[in-house]
Amino acid sequence: MEGWRISLLEKERTIFVDADACPVKDEVLKTAADFDVKVVFVASFEHFQITRKEEENWTYVDPHKEAADLYIANHVRPGDVVVTQDIGLASLLLGKKVYVMSERGYLFEENSIDHALFRRHVAQKLRRSGRYTKGPKKLVKEDRERFVKELQKILSKIEGFTY
């Protein structure tokens, strides 16, 4: 994503979180607060809770499996940050000049997204044929630390600082 940087004066920066199964919501909130960046959690109505924290901004969408993805895709602008584990959504957003990162702190990039999509496709084919494929490993402390560090790096880059 080198070569383009958008001034904060142009628009309010937003972090969108594909929130239904996101394990790093607290880390997103804390890091965003450090940089004074707006966070929008997008989740299905099936995950609605009345007891959300006041500082959290939640948007609820239909329970359709792609509804949160479509909401995010339709509301992001160049320079925004999206946190998702959905490789298909990441692929769509990269063309919109959006920073897309996984919950483990890995940045999706245009030069490697095709390989990630291919791996996902192969795993789906194996599952459909009855073969077992391992799911993701449990998120550990090091994953959370990597996530925070990478999010800080992205937000610093957007603001024109080095971290």
Curated annotation (Swiss-Prot):
UniProt cross-references to CDD domains, sorted A to Z: PIN_YqxD-like
Signal peptide positions on this chain: none
Intrachain S-S bonds: none
PANTHER family noted in UniProt: UPF0178 PROTEIN YAII
Family: Belongs to the UPF0178 family.
HAMAP family membership: UPF0178
Name this polypeptide is given: UPF0178 protein BLi02714/BL03680
